[in-house]
Every structure is written in structure tokens, then in C-alpha cells.
Amino acid sequence: MNTRFLDACWGKPVDTVPVWLMRQAGRYLPDYMRVRSKCTFLELCKTPELATEVTVQPVDILGVDAAILFSDILTPIEPMGMELDFTPGPVFAKPIRTMADVEALKIPKMETDVPYVLDAVKLLRKELAAKVPLIGFGGAPFTLACYMVEGKGSKDFAALKKMMYADPEVYAALMEKITTMDMEYLNAQIKAGAQAIQIFDTWGGMLSPADYERYVLPYTQRLINGLDRTNIPVIHFVKGAGTMLEIVKQAGGDVMGLDWHVNLGKARDILGDMAVQGNLDPTVLFAPNEIIEREVKRVLDENAGRPGLIFNLGHGILPTVPPEKAIFMVDCVHRLSRK
């Protein structure tokens, strides 16, 4: 098996910088669209054989150094008692607004409530055995709360922030419950065979550093501390957190995910020996090849040869990116960083 990704997570020497892409199994790939055309998004998430097929596609097509389970961060929320639909974005029919709503949420039994996720992990370990490691993942408690309280995507998640400030007891009770669920969900993925875990906090960066420290950090800290992490690296990605890396680092984990709004070299100076993942602007993949190569080289140069770099985009790959651009980017990373 290609162990570059896991080695880099632990800061070990590698022959070339490993690379994978957030949302690498997705709409930009014709092979993915062929599978997706036969089912709904939720059916794809809930059918282990199909989830396995689309998870493996980018490994074979792009030549990336890790696979990430095909699923959605909101998958474990539905069995907590919230009706979820994708039309096309995520929508909860009845958002959480009161203490009674929080108390009505249950902690799912992962083996019986989301067996399709765990079955996909087991299938993937067999499928990928001679290829690359498998990353399991979940949403951070704060980002999950954003969707559960708002009921759908939002630019400012005002309903969640209103709860945070005006109903702190309800907010705390909700966050505690989500954190407990999240811990059990990610530990179930680890038990099923996930070789690394990524925690996505897509909306954590919309808070001030002080609010992040008060309202988010304790829960992410508790989540990471509660994972069965023996030989399982944890990647913590908070989009938009470039101004508060010192605080985010306190959450724990082994690898800090970085978006493209931060200079990777300066981030490494702040983070010390902690491994990092990132951080190319996803829209660079629309550029001519010479610009893609220039930007890949810039990120590698900012790293200055330090161990513990996993190359990635600063957020998910966009659906309209030509696949050949992603293939070229992966090749650039390997070629330019080869020892």
C-alpha cells in the first residue's frame, strides 16, 4: 500500500508530497455522474456498493494518495430524529429551536442506524487494500449545529448565532448532544476500518476568535479527545480560521487543514511541528496548466521542504472543473516535490 499520506500525517519523511482533494469523488467526474444518474444523492450515500464505487474512482483516475469515504456530514443527523432532504441542498423539515427539540434528539446506535456507512468502510478497506489509505470523516459539532438550527444552508446562520447568544443553555445542551453523537459516529468508522479521520468545520471560521474559543473549542476538543486514536491521525479543518490558528490548534488533532486565505509557510510557523493539509485555491484548477503548475510550486515553496505536508485544495473541488486539470495538478505535486 502507498503509505505517503499516513507518513506525512505523522511528520515522517516521504519520497514525494502526498495529495488528495476534498470532494474528490464528485460531480466533476463523468464516472461519478454515470453512477449518480441512477439514484438520488441520499440513495448513493446509503448504498455501500455504490458509495464504494465512487470513493475508489478518483484514486484510479487522479492518482491521489488517499481515498475519502463518500458520504455527507449530515448522514448521522437523520437518525437522531431529524427528517433530511436534499433539494438539492440539505433541508431539515423541523429545525431545532427549543430545549424540548434538543431533548427529543436521540443518540443513534451506529451499527443499526447507519449500517450503510460502516459497511461502505469495510468494503473500501478490502477494495483499497493494495492501493491507498481510507479517510473517514464527520462534521464538527458547530457546523452540524448550524444546519440543525437553521434548517438549511445559510450565509450567516443567524438562527444558530441567535441561539448561541440569547439561549446559551439550549445551545450548550445541543452541542453536548451532537458531540456525543459525533464521537460515537467517528469511533464506529474507526472500528470499521477507517485509517484516518477528517473533521470538517466548514462554518467555524465565521465566528470571531473570542466566540470560537468560547462557543466551539470546548466541544471540538472533547470530540477529538474522545476518539480511539491509536495510530489513527485526525485532520481538523476549520474553513476561514487563518486568523485564529493558535486557538484552533488547542482543539487537538494531528493535522491542521488550511484554506487558501492563509500563507502556508506562516501557518506552519504558528503551528510548529503540527502537520498541515492544503491549501490551493480550488478555482486555480480553471487556469491554464502553466498557472496550475506555478501555484502548486508556490504552495510547495511556502512549505520550504518541511515534513508533514499533505497537499490539498483549500476547500472542495468545484463541480465544473475539467478532470484533466485535477489529474495535472496531482501530477505536478508529485513531480515537483519528488525527493
UniProtKB/Swiss-Prot annotation:
**Which GO biological process categories is it annotated with?**
protoporphyrinogen IX biosynthetic process from glutamate
Kindly indicate whether the keyword Lyase belongs to this entry.
yes
Query: What is the superkingdom listed in this entry's lineage?
Result: Bacteria
Task: Report the coiled-coil segments.
Answer: none
Q: Give the reactions, separated by semicolons, that this protein catalyses.
A: uroporphyrinogen III + 4 H(+) = coproporphyrinogen III + 4 CO2
Q: Which is an annotated Pfam family here?
A: URO-D
Task: Name the residues that bind substrate.
Answer: R23, Q24, A25, G26, R27, D72, Y147, T202, H315
Primary residence: cytoplasm
- InterPro entries the UniProt entry points to: UROD/MetE-like_sf, Uroporphyrinogen_deCO2ase_HemE, Uroporphyrinogen_deCOase
Listed A to Z, the keywords are:
Cytoplasm, Decarboxylase, Lyase, Porphyrin biosynthesis
Keyword Nucleotide-binding in annotation: no
Which EC number(s) does UniProt give?
A: 4.1.1.37
The pathway to which it is assigned is: Porphyrin-containing compound metabolism; protoporphyrin-IX biosynthesis; coproporphyrinogen-III from 5-aminolevulinate: step 4/4
Q: Which GO terms describe its molecular function?
A: uroporphyrinogen decarboxylase activity
HAMAP family, alphabetically? Answer: URO_D
The UniProt entry's sequence similarity note says: Belongs to the uroporphyrinogen decarboxylase family.
Which PANTHER family does the record match to this protein? METHYLTETRAHYDROFOLATE:HOMOCYSTEINE METHYLTRANSFERASE RELATED (PTHR21091), UROPORPHYRINOGEN DECARBOXYLASE (PTHR21091:SF169)
Query: What is this protein's record name?
Result: Uroporphyrinogen decarboxylase
- In its UniProt entry, the species of origin is given as Geobacter sp. (strain M21)
